[in-house]
Amino acid sequence: EWVPIKPKTDAAFLFSLIHVLLHEMPREKLDVPFLKQHTGSPYLIGPNGFYLRDPATKKPLLWDLKRNAAVSFDTPDTDPALDGAFTLDAIEVGADEAMWTHRGITAETAFGKLAARVKPYTPEWAEKTCDVREGTVRRIAAEYVEQAQVGATVVIDGETLPYRPVSIQFGRTVNNGWGAYECCWARTL
């Protein structure tokens, strides 16, 4: 299906699509185990916008729901929180090895920050920007989730892998000119 989007407003459409996925779809429709175990979504973010890290190892921290504590991302047998605010002691390492030590800081997860960031980008907002009707955005988001077949697998060369028959493809002009960064960022999500 071709969806005519006003030129250079692809990011608005994609941000609203992400909004629907994170704020209007049931959480169990998303691949939560993948987000928890194979992405930086559960990593805790410091006040300067960088990952909070273990002071001894400098490994990124996440909040483990089993232990009710911050642990390094590679700690075995964890149940990482995707949402919430948690109090902990940690360091934050920024660009050029700038380092901040935090005591009793309250931090959120990367996923929580993303969800908050895209909350204002409703399909109604996008319709005014990119000329795609809000109902079309919601329908496409629902089709995307339905066709993703979360939990389904496929065997390739004897290895069982997650089956992911859904993707968003770039066209030539999407990544050229102003607005390209935002569009590429949203598309990558």
What are the language-model segments listed below?
Residues 2-155:
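Long, well-ordered, tryptophan-enriched scaffold segments
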Residues 138-189:
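Acidic catalytic cores of enzymes that act on phosphate-bearing nucleotides/polynucleotides
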